[in-house]
């Protein structure tokens, strides 16, 4: 669907649901809302302006006469559709920009460097019978503790494996994933032998960006004796790949058409057989 058609639908929805009582308003413009399909796509705000304080458009806008359900006429200005200069989507261009900025910042710390504060102490998570201990770049342990911190049962889910980690991160890319869902992984292998498979336990530790404190947020068994442990880390948010792309924001301005101008415009439209789009009253 072309962007003009999408914007037209947004304006129609706004006109259908909005009442325009200019004399009762404190502010000259009436902001209906912000529209966007996701946090990467451009955001569009729609503002309705009264006759005595109209919007003055530039040359880069398209205009269209619209009717609301009360028959009031508005001249709305929509951003012109940009001609595609490449086969890339706006999301891909955003990602490409982030990658280029990342490469240009020579002193930018890598995700592993940003994770170093986790080495200061081990993190724990309690889930029912079991407790889980994560010691950064050392090991992940599953244990059951009773009175006075007495360990009565324990399994090592894995010890840090730098070679397996490097190989894993070479084959997995999060560039196409929304920044809020990206994570950086470390692989821990050679854990306690699994009774069901006869192989050592393994765990993938997934580090995610979170502004709150560092903590283990979840532990999942992906398959028999193979686990995924999620750790949130505030310092990881400093890396561009884990920062949310800020979408471009546009405002669609709709000027109330004065009665005199409305009559003139009606005659012109009838002469060229151009009628405004009517919005059905629901």
Curated annotation (Swiss-Prot):
Top-level taxonomic group: Eukaryota
PROSITE patterns per UniProt: MRH (PS51914)
Phenotype reported upon loss of the gene: No visible phenotype under normal growth conditions, but mutant plants have enhanced sensitivity to salt stress.
Basic and acidic residues bias locations: 262-276
Chain positions carrying an annotated carbohydrate: 94, 169, 190
Places the protein is found: Endoplasmic reticulum
Residues in MRH domain copies: 120-239
Major location category of this protein: endoplasmic reticulum
Protein name: Protein OS-9 homolog
Lineage: Eukaryota, Viridiplantae, Streptophyta, Embryophyta, Tracheophyta
